[in-house]
């Protein structure tokens, strides 16, 4: 199933406690110097503007929306998982749906959190390296209040495209299903100096969003079971990545753009 419109969020809404309200508010910057506060506000504003500007020119096409709908039935709420390199594409594709995302407690995490909050996301602060348990507890609370969650599943610092256990543990504690998702633009830049080689779509390109069947995690799963679910999630995302790259190749081979533009080469002289 495919289409160009954004998928509708069907998760229930209950209420907001203090943790949930905090996730949707900008964090206090009083612990930072004036220079760092200015940097956070400036960079977050620029990042928001760039994503909004680029995103408004991208035509998104969704495949597998029935899997997202299945994960949202009978009181269930999806736990979105995708690779960190797709964060710009994901932010715009699923904007305005009150999804709560775990963001790093680092300086960089401050402006990323503010940028995504402007698109209607909540942000809990923590990662696999800093404050992860506390952030996971906050995500459990927000999901119990009816809010979906999302993980850049190889973040915040990699290794690139290697699944980490946060989403598995959240699914175990909440009973909600994990939904693997992959994104690919038809034309893009890659930030090769960043650890994840962040994907920046080129203006007026298309973007394919492929959604895999949900993965459920039993509440009594043991350590070996967690490892098995990690492999299942890894395999699902790897398969989605291959499908995305196949779509990109097929799309560009039939594109009306001249070959030298598709290759990123100079115009023939």
Regions found by a protein language model. Give the residues of each.
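Non-catalytic C-terminal accessory region of glycerolipid acyltransferases
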Residues: 2-52, 72, 118, 133-269
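A short, well-structured juxtamembrane/interface segment
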Residues: 52-77, 83-89
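Short, flexible loop segments at the rims of nucleotide/cofactor-binding pockets, characterized by
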Residues: 55-60, 79, 126-130, 156-157
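A residue-level signal for beta-strand positions that form part of recognition/binding surfaces
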Residues: 57, 98, 206-208
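Structural signal for conserved beta-strand scaffold positions within catalytic alpha/beta enzyme cores
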Residues: 62, 101-103, 125, 180, ...
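Pocket-edge structural micro-motifs
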Residues: 62-64, 82, 103, 213, ...
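Short amphipathic alpha-helical segments and helix-helix/interface helices
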Residues: 68-69, 91, 113, 167-168
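Catalytic core of membrane glycerolipid acyltransferases/transacylases, capturing the structured
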Residues: 76-130, 134, 174, 190
């Amino acid at each position: 199933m495919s289409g160009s419109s954004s998928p509708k969020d069907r998760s229930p809404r209950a209420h907001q406690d203090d943790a949930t309200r905090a996730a949707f508010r900008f964090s206090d910057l009083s612990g930072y110097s004036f220079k760092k506060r200015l940097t956070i506000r400036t960079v977050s504003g620029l990042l928001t503007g760039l994503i909004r500007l680029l995103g408004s020119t991208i035509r998104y096409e969704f495949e597998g929306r029935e899997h997202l709908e299945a994960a949202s039935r009978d009181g269930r709420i999806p736990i979105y998982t995708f690779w960190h390199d797709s964060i710009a594409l994901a932010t715009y594709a699923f904007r305005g749906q009150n999804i709560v995302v775990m963001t790093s407690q680092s300086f960089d995490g401050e402006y990323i959190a503010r940028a995504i909050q402007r698109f209607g996301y909540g942000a809990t602060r923590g990662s696999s390296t800093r404050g992860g348990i506390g952030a996971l507890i906050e995500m459990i609370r927000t999901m119990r209040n009816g809010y979906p969650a999302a993980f850049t599943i190889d973040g915040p610092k990699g290794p690139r495209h290697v699944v980490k256990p946060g989403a598995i543990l959240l699914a175990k504690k909440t009973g909600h299903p994990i939904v693997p998702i992959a994104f690919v633009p038809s034309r893009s830049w890659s930030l090769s100096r960043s650890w994840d080689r962040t994907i920046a779509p080129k203006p007026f390109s298309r973007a394919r969003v492929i959604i895999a069947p949900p993965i459920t995690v039993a509440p009594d799963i043991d350590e070996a079971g967690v490892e098995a679910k990690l492999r299942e999630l890894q395999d699902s995302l790897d398969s989605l990545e291959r499908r995305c790259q196949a779509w990109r190749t097929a799309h560009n081979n039939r594109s009306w753009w001249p070959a030298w533009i598709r290759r990123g080469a100079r115009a023939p002289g």
